[in-house]
């Protein structure tokens, strides 16, 4: 019996091995693309930026590729690139969700399987159009690139990312053009370069034509880099300045959890921030304003709740510093019964040394699914009991600007809390409402020493370029930094260390609205027109060949 069991087991294992070996060979180009994309995104150098999707797209232009086969090839690519770039999902599920490691890894695999399905949908749709309208290989490549560009900005995802962000990460000056087309527009340009590289590959047997296209591609890329460099110079004008000191207390995850549960850690955390702020003021006595990260003050800070114990501790520590403070904290309406009402908000406050609210607090609007609210919990409240570790914050009405009056004039701070810095439309709203300086407060402690802190950092800094407003970023564990409207990134804090630093924030008073702020993602119209033209030309050529 044991011998029979061993024989059956070995036979099954061999069959499974042969099956996966065969599939791996079939999808070798899809696997290669997944690796290229995953290792060209933040925090890796963008070494394959303009050809990372090319192997996948060339594969689906082959005559033997069906819609079904193309979809699964795209699925393999998105699974691998997600596994590389978003491996931190498992760590976060374990730390934030307090799930066992086995369940956390399962959550990662599910995330990889379903989160970026727009990639296989784009290649499958491109294949269908190729078969339906008899598109050539080159036309199919550009069709897929344009479909991908449209889908990545409309497909519902938890974390919006694309290849445009690699430009600011790697300091390729083309990123300066984001104030014209946004980083989504730059991503579309990168995708078109991928299609162009694929076209060069398809024409490799025609050496002269392939080399001419490769040369033209290189010249076009160089021209865009040069244009970006020249365009960025226009934002070197400043007529305002404020000195902001950011305090990073490096509060651990368990301490944050205990503070949220109302334990003694609330006082410990408050005093730690005050002590670090006192030391920072001695080091930077010219500071105009202090900035603490998301929920750095782990209690309510509304004007009507300043008599609470921890608010009084905060006030007693702020008074000797004689500086206003921007900090994350919790907020609640005056009419709310704290014991019964659940409308607690994740908020951003601007207070004077006496704790007085200098403007109404900004309450977070773009809540993180499964982190700050549970989808469908309003319709099915029992879900909150099944998943008690998921927070249930109220939703604010942003974007909103906080006004700070100084002897030199008013400064308008445009607040972003955590992942709100990833939404271009949100920051456009802040610029439209007159924000002079953007301030992003966040807590990346849940992600450990993974890729996420660097990804989150540069995806947030990108908003400053789109709207051409300086941005100060205050985090609990790093990376805290600031970027000016001209793209200059100032000093950056270390990860997972106590730290404080002063940033001289130069800005332009009443700065003009950028083209992107005024018109948004206008380029989708161009993408649709070009897509229609490519498909239409392919269809006409096919008809003429038949006739």
Curated annotation (Swiss-Prot):
Membrane topology qualifier = Multi-pass membrane protein
Instruction: Provide one Gene Ontology biological process annotation.
Output: lipoprotein biosynthetic process
Active-site residues annotated for this sequence: 294, 364, 418
Q: What class of enzyme is it?
A: transferase
- Listed InterPro entries: Apolipo_AcylTrfase (IPR004563), C-N_Hydrolase (IPR003010), C-N_Hydrolase_sf (IPR036526), LNT_N (IPR045378)
Specify the CN hydrolase domain's residue ranges. 247-515
SUPFAM superfamilies, A to Z? Carbon-nitrogen hydrolase (SSF56317)
**Record-listed E.C. numbers:** 2.3.1.269
Q: Which PROSITE patterns match?
A: CN_HYDROLASE (PS50263)
A GO molecular-function descriptor: N-acyltransferase activity
Pathway involvement of the protein, from the record: Protein modification; lipoprotein biosynthesis (N-acyl transfer)
Q: Does the keyword Protein transport apply?
A: no
PANTHER family cross-referenced by the UniProt entry: APOLIPOPROTEIN N-ACYLTRANSFERASE
Q: What keywords would UniProt list here? A: Acyltransferase, Cell inner membrane, Cell membrane, Membrane, Transferase, Transmembrane, Transmembrane helix
From which source organism is this entry?
Answer: Bdellovibrio bacteriovorus (strain ATCC 15356 / DSM 50701 / NCIMB 9529 / HD100)
> What is the recorded name of this protein?
Apolipoprotein N-acyltransferase
Against CDD domains, the record matches this protein to: ALP_N-acyl_transferase
Q: What is the lineage of its organism?
A: Bacteria, Pseudomonadati, Bdellovibrionota, Bdellovibrionia, Bdellovibrionales
Transmembrane domains' residue ranges: 31-51, 71-91, 106-126, 180-200, 210-230, 515-535
- Role according to the record: Catalyzes the phospholipid dependent N-acylation of the N-terminal cysteine of apolipoprotein, the last step in lipoprotein maturation.
- UniProt record similarity statement: Belongs to the CN hydrolase family. Apolipoprotein N-acyltransferase subfamily.
Q: Which domain of life is it from?
A: Bacteria
